[in-house]
Amino acid sequence: MRITKPITLYRDLSYFHSLLKSCIHGEISSSPITIFRDLLRSSLTPNHFTMSIFLQATTTSFNSFKLQVEQVQTHLTKSGLDRFVYVKTSLLNLYLKKGCVTSAQMLFDEMPERDTVVWNALICGYSRNGYECDAWKLFIVMLQQGFSPSATTLVNLLPFCGQCGFVSQGRSVHGVAAKSGLELDSQVKNALISFYSKCAELGSAEVLFREMKDKSTVSWNTMIGAYSQSGLQEEAITVFKNMFEKNVEISPVTIINLLSAHVSHEPLHCLVVKCGMVNDISVVTSLVCAYSRCGCLVSAERLYASAKQDSIVGLTSIVSCYAEKGDMDIAVVYFSKTRQLCMKIDAVALVGILHGCKKSSHIDIGMSLHGYAIKSGLCTKTLVVNGLITMYSKFDDVETVLFLFEQLQETPLISWNSVISGCVQSGRASTAFEVFHQMMLTGGLLPDAITIASLLAGCSQLCCLNLGKELHGYTLRNNFENENFVCTALIDMYAKCGNEVQAESVFKSIKAPCTATWNSMISGYSLSGLQHRALSCYLEMREKGLKPDEITFLGVLSACNHGGFVDEGKICFRAMIKEFGISPTLQHYALMVGLLGRACLFTEALYLIWKMDIKPDSAVWGALLSACIIHRELEVGEYVARKMFMLDYKNGGLYVLMSNLYATEAMWDDVVRVRNMMKDNGYDGYLGVSQI
């Protein structure tokens, strides 16, 4: 009978080296710490090569903790293996990988000898851990001591120069790369292209790109990204076409860069499907954001629903888009979904949702969002507080606006501007000027163009021409007259203060007036009783090729209303709908109904109200009732009054109008009846009292 001896596996250092190398490449699931402990339990003694491989394996492992790293360093010290520079370099890399920057710095300082590798390792580690300034300082010292940087070092330094706009420092890195021959390295060249594009040096980026002989996918993506960041859509598309023609592999980054350049998303979506990227969450998220930006919310929702993984960026994009459209009910549904998925909304996303709270009916939603900001800690962010200030301003809640402002630890100019603008929007211009004086007393801050525009709007409210002129002088001294929105505010201020000559002068001084500026001039003429000039201004605007918006037509219809230009009003109203595709608001309908009513065209006015796409409010019916009083049209007036009572029976002005209508026909019994009804509902009929 033959006896077979059991085979024993001979485990020498090479066996453990092989296991550790497998850890580096991710070929086995065992922890490097576990393998190293097995080695120590055997009779084998690790050498400096063992420690170098072990430290590299530990660097790539996600299961290492700071305590274990310190234990490894203790073992190195006891065994004397820490005298080898490359072993200490591996340990330094391990510290940096785990975010122990201070420990890495101490280890570097203790090293009696340093080679190029350890210098590069610490510089790259600083950069990866957010210590870019320290990385730059160390880079300077390294060059002074005669050591040469690696390609990885330069690649890690250039993003810092680009983000901070340090053009001269970035060019210095380029110079070092050229002298050392590292400029030929594709990674360095890509980093240089990205740096120059971030610093608005596209010419230099283009030269580097053209010089590249072997352009990889990363190189093409970098150039497309450079054009995208600069808003050059056509150039980004041209580079992509060249990339496509040369059969270069398209990556998810290619698609993301093109979408950020606002390239048409539908063809790119088709390309994503063809290239099999439909499961890439970053690509799907970018497409969702692109569809949301264009207002294609149905497509955005479907695409988001088809994704295998939820994305906070995609979801907040949909929420913000609905909020921007004013569909707060749907926005709240999606916002609730983020809470159910335990996603944390950031400050930018929350402010986007807050901007959607525009109507008084949104106050409960706005206060709930305020509560979320407090619970999540976002209320400490200046950006969020400014968003809340803007929101409460829309609700005319100036007290809360001032309270929020007082809670700010730091008050940058943007916060002062938010409060000043909020007070003006709420009809509290005097409070806005008090806040402005407080800002000037604090010192250190000077008003900018936005401050001046808000204060000019306050002057318009108060009809304070002298103060408006002082602000105009400040505008000229500080070259703010080049800002269209400041000039628009100046025109509005002069027009509302009755100085249409000066308003015209400001308007004529503008080289290229925008639509808002034309709107301000049209409204100014209308307010000043110059209705013919308002219509001429509108026609001139159209001749210049500018597209009127809904504000333009408010000014034009107001001019037609006050001037009694019925035919012109009808033409403009039709043009607004059919030619420019603008849906009339309640204000447009109120002006048009008032125009028809004043012209005794009551049948047309009623027909217009009946075919409205939106429910008429008291302002629309009130415009017709006022016309009935003027023309003593009792039958239509009573019909309109019944409609208004159904909408708001507590409206004291309605009782006064009905009383006046009956008085024009000497129907005194009805006057008494309406007056009694008014008193029964708590109104005395006095809308104002004079002390004279």
UniProtKB/Swiss-Prot annotation:
Pfam entry (one): E_motif
Superkingdom in the source lineage: Eukaryota
GO biological process, one term: RNA modification
Keyword entries, A-Z: Repeat
Residues in PPR repeats: 12-46, 47-83, 84-114, 115-149, 150-184, 185-215, 216-250, 280-314, 316-345, 346-380, 381-411, 412-447, 448-482, 483-513, 514-548, 549-584, 585-615
MF-aspect GO terms: RNA binding
Residue numbers spanned by region Type E motif: 620-692
InterPro entries: E_motif, Pentatricopeptide_rpt, PPR_At4g14850-like_plant, TPR-like_helical_dom_sf
UniProt keyword annotation of NADP present: no
PANTHER family for this protein: PENTATRICOPEPTIDE REPEAT-CONTAINING PROTEIN
Family affiliation: Belongs to the PPR family. PCMP-E subfamily.
Protein's UniProt name: Pentatricopeptide repeat-containing protein At2g04860
Gene: PCMP-E74
